[in-house]
Amino acid sequence: MPDCAIIQGVTIVKRTAYPELATGDQVPQQHIRKATGADRQRISEIRFAVRENRPSNPALIERLVDWLFANSTVWVWEEDGVIQGFSAADPRDESICALFVHPCYERRGIGRALLPLACDVLKDSGYTTAVLSTEAGTRAERFYRTDGWTEVGCKEDGQIIFQKNVWGSTRCSSPSCS
């Protein structure tokens, strides 16, 4: 069986990620797209479901999602019609505002695929660097360090501020980007 299959002429899916599928079974269809207003509820659910970097007040999540849609470009990873993760970048201030994957779908490369798209939003807005912050001692901190982000400071609330050069980075090369 080949490593990849072309579905409907455009979506490439790695079959090796789903070894339980036998030949002839339906292969999940994955793609990344810009979020729409219809995605707000699912994005809120994902933001609430994460185990780390959780807001202390769940009511803040809806306001956060409203803010993301009003002030940033939001990308979603969708598989078989289910949004599994999202990223957002604010082109006004070189920041990556959000990168979250639902816990049920972690460790599958979704965050790694979404992050370059958020960086591209900033690059297209003329920035050479991107900044973001995350709680210390979390998986997110390790993820960003492994991805080449440099610690440049600390917020009053203890979150670590990271920065990365986006000018030399390449656009999302994942076949799932649409």
Regions inferred by a protein language model and the residue ranges of each:
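Acetyl-CoA-dependent GNAT
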Residues: Q30, K34-C104, L115-P116, V121, ...
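Active-site acidic-Proline motif in GNAT/NAT acetyltransferases
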Residues: H102-R108, A136
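Active-site beta-strand termini and strand-to-loop segments that position acidic
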Residues: E78-D80, K164-W167
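Conserved N-terminal entry element of GNAT/NAT acetyltransferase domains
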Residues: P2-A38, G168-S178
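Short glycine/proline-centered loop/turn elements that form peptide/ligand docking sites
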Residues: L115, G137-A140, D157-F162
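Conserved catalytic-core motifs of GNAT/GCN5-like acyltransferases
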Residues: V131-S133, R145, T150-K164
